Amino acid sequence: MVYKVKSHVAGQVWKTVAKVGDQLAADDVIAIIECMKMEIPVVAPVAGTLVELFAAEKDIVAEDQDIAVVQGV
């Protein structure tokens, strides 16, 4: 099953931790968003493979914006 991963807050992508093709465990950090001087992790909802990453470092993202797609195992 394919899972879309969304940003829970509006802010700037401070760091992308995972790369397309990476194998992820549930709750692995995909990216970190800076919002009001706080770092908010965007995590994988399930174990699987990161198949798409829509945001790059320094991109501005909106709340509920798609950040990534994970193909579950």
Model feature map: region roles:
Residues M1-Q12, V29-P45, G72:
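Short beta-strand-turn/beta-hairpin segments enriched in glycine/proline and small hydrophobics
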Residues K15, P41, D59:
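Active-site-proximal flexible loops/turns
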Residues K15-Q23, E52-A55:
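Short histidine-centered loop motifs in beta-beta connectors
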Residues G21-I30, K58-I67:
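A structural signal for short beta-strand/turn segments enriched in small hydrophobics and glycine
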Residues E34, E39, E52, E57, ...:
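Acidic-residue sensor for enzyme active/binding pockets
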Residues V51-E52, V69-Q71:
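Short alpha-helical linear motifs
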